[in-house]
C-alpha cells in the first residue's frame, strides 16, 4: 500500500482556536482524521505529524526516506524562513505539495516568499481546510500515474 505523509508545522495544533477568521474553525485533528479516512477509502495509507519545532519536522522528513511515497506539507511560518526544511525535502527526494490554509499572498509581505514552492510539485493556498482535500487528491493522482507507469514498463 502506498504511503502519504501529512506534515504540519508550527501553531497548526492551535487550529480551531487560533484566528478562526483566517484559519477556520476545524481542528487539526478533524483535518487529519478526515484525510486519513479519505486516503484509506482509496487504498492509501496516510500518516500525520505536527511539530512546532523545526528539528522535529526535519527528523520526521528524514524518517520518511524510502518508506513514504508522497508528502503533503503545511510548513506554517517555516515556509518563509527554513532553508533546512527545504534541504531535508530535497535530501529524501519524495515528491511533495505545499498547502496553506490562508492566502499567503493576500497577507503581510514577509509571507509572500516560500523556500519550498519552487521545488514542490504544487502549491495550494487560501482554500481553508478544503485545500488539504485537494492536496490529497493530487497526491493520489500522482501516485496512480507512477503505478500505471510501473505496470506498463514492468
UniProtKB/Swiss-Prot annotation:
Catalysed reactions, semicolon-separated: 3-dehydroquinate = 3-dehydroshikimate + H2O
The EC number(s) this enzyme carries: 4.2.1.10
Active-site residues (renumbered): 23, 100
Keyword terms of this UniProt record: Amino-acid biosynthesis, Aromatic amino acid biosynthesis, Lyase
Pathway: Metabolic intermediate biosynthesis; chorismate biosynthesis; chorismate from D-erythrose 4-phosphate and phosphoenolpyruvate: step 3/7
Assembly and binders: Homododecamer.
Record's protein name: 3-dehydroquinate dehydratase
Amino acid at each position: 500500500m502506498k504511503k502519504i505523509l501529512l506534515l504540519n508545522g508550527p501553531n497548526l495544533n492551535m487550529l480551531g482556536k487560533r484566528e478562526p477568521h483566517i484559519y477556520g474553525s476545524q481542528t487539526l485533528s478533524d483535518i487529519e482524521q478526515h484525510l486519513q479516512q479519505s486516503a484509506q477509502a482509496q487504498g492509501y495509507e496516510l500518516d500525520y505529524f505536527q511539530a512546532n519545532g523545526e528539528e522535529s519536522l526535519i527528523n520526521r522528513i528524514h524518517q520518511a526516506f524510502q518508506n513514504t511515497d508522497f508528502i503533503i506539507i503545511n510548513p506554517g511560518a517555516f515556509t518563509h524562513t527554513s532553508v533546512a526544511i527545504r534541504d531535508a525535502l530535497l535530501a529524501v527526494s519524495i515528491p511533495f505539495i505545499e498547502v496553506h490554509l490562508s492566502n499567503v499572498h493576500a497577507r503581510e509581505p514577509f509571507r509572500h516568499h516560500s523556500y519550498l514552492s519552487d521545488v514542490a510539485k504544487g502549491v495550494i493556498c487560501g482554500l481553508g481546510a478544503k485545500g488539504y482535500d485537494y492536496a490529497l487528491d493530487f497526491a493520489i493522482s500522482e501516485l496512480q500515474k507512477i503505478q500505471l507507469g510501473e505496470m506498463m514498463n514492468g
